[in-house]
Structures are given as C-alpha cells and as structure tokens.
C-alpha cells in the first residue's frame, strides 16, 4: 500500500499473513522487538470498538491528557486478532 502524501517514490506498508503462527509473549507495549503501529483516528473510543468487534483485544485504558500547548491528545492501545499492538490516537485543539 502506498502511503498518502507522497509521489511515485513513496514509502510502502506491507502487510503479511501466515498460515502457521508462532506463539509469542502476551501483548505489551514495551515487549522486545517490533513495538507498535499508530493510527490517527477521529474518535478513539469508536475506533477501539471497531477493532474489538473485529477480534482485537484491549491492552490498556483510553487516556486523555492536555499538552503544554493546550491541545488534548487521547490514545489507547489494542491488539489486532493476531496480537500485534496498535495505538489509536486523536488530537484536538
């Protein structure tokens, strides 16, 4: 998949699926190896519900903090059905 906002020589995102899965440690944001991928979403709770409906799991609570420039950031961590950690985040003024 070509990432938006780039011309022909754009970075790509490759997603693989395997028939045989290797058991690994439980999902944790700070586990060794690949960390997580983050997505900016319009509404964190709605996006989280969609991930859970598709077979994902909760990794932590939904958190909202005010930043030093008076914006708010809301985020949470979930896993996809294969256990990959996903961060869902939303910024507001």
Task: Please describe what each predicted stretch is.
Residues 1-39, 48-79, 91-93:
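Vicinal oxygen chelate
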Residues 82:
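Conserved ATPase active-site switch/coordination loops adjacent to the nucleotide-binding site
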